[in-house]
């Protein structure tokens, strides 16, 4: 039986080879890189971290800042007598401007172009404040030289609400005969203490202020000085061994 009789026709053959076209898949195009410049992949360059150089003190400094420290009447004479010792470290070491305003009775401290340290204004204000509270100039000057020193103030009545003779006896226990108790606490705890009526001011490091405050509070609450001496010496020896 012939194929023509069944009505079926055979497919025609083309010899030119264009009957089938090979199509490349997109995946193979992405994976294969042709060196002759046919297909190329763009690789994103990693972003470089921004570089910010340190800013100098002149650019960082904004408008001039000022601090004012009020001086009570009973500290006018000591301030006048020690004025040379007070303004010399503020001007030479901290590069600040300082003056005493006679109208407002304030010590005014101001920054200027020569000021390098940002914290200089705070150090100078703490130095003046310590002197106004009653500390000696040499003791208060440690606030300028050292960064880890602080001032703490509290009232005797904050520890125990005492009145009249009871309050006077509590202050006397803190001071001791001829100031012996106060000097002992200062030497053991390496702090400086000022008793101003019912106010107590302590100058020292954080840990030493804590030791001195605990000893003074125990004296206010009625503990005998001998027991307080033993306690602070034990705490001081333990702290020295730890550090």
UniProtKB/Swiss-Prot annotation:
Keywords: Nucleus, RNA-binding. It comes from Oryzias latipes. This is RNA-binding protein PNO1. Belongs to the PNO1 family. The keyword Magnesium does not apply. It is found in: Nucleus, Nucleolus. Residues 11-21 have a biased composition (Basic and acidic residues). Residues 164-216 form the KH domain. One of its GO terms (biological process) is ribosome biogenesis. Residues 1-60 are annotated as: Disordered. GO terms for cellular component: nucleolus; nucleus. PANTHER family: RIBONUCLEASE Y, RNA-BINDING PROTEIN PNO1. GO terms for molecular function: RNA binding.
């Amino acid at each position: 039986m012939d194929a023509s009789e069944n009505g079926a026709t055979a497919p025609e053959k083309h010899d030119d080879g264009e009957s089938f076209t090979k199509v490349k898949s997109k995946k193979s195009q992405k994976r294969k890189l042709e060196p002759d410049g046919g297909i190329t992949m763009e690789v994103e360059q990693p972003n470089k971290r921004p570089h910010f150089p340190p800013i100098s003190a002149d650019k960082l400094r904004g408008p001039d800042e000022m601090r004012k420290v009020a001086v009570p009447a009973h500290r006018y004479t000591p301030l006048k007598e020690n004025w040379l010792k007070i303004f010399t470290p503020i001007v030479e070491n901290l590069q600040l401007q300082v003056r005493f305003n006679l109208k407002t009775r304030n010590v005014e401290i101001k920054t200027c172009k020569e000021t390098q340290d940002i914290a200089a204004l705070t150090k100078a204000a703490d130095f003046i404040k310590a002197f106004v509270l009653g500390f000696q100039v040499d003791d208060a000057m440690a606030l300028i030289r050292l960064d880890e020193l602080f001032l703490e103030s509290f009232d005797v009545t904050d520890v125990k609400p005492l009145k009249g003779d009871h309050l006077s006896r509590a202050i006397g226990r803190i001071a001791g005969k001829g100031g012996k108790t106060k000097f002992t606490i200062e030497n053991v705890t390496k702090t400086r203490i000022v008793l101003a009526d019912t106010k107590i001011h302590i100058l020292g490091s954080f840990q030493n202020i804590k030791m001195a405050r605990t000893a003074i509070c125990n004296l206010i609450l009625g503990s005998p000085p001998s027991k307080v001496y033993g306690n602070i010496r034990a705490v001081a020896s333990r702290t020295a061994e730890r550090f």
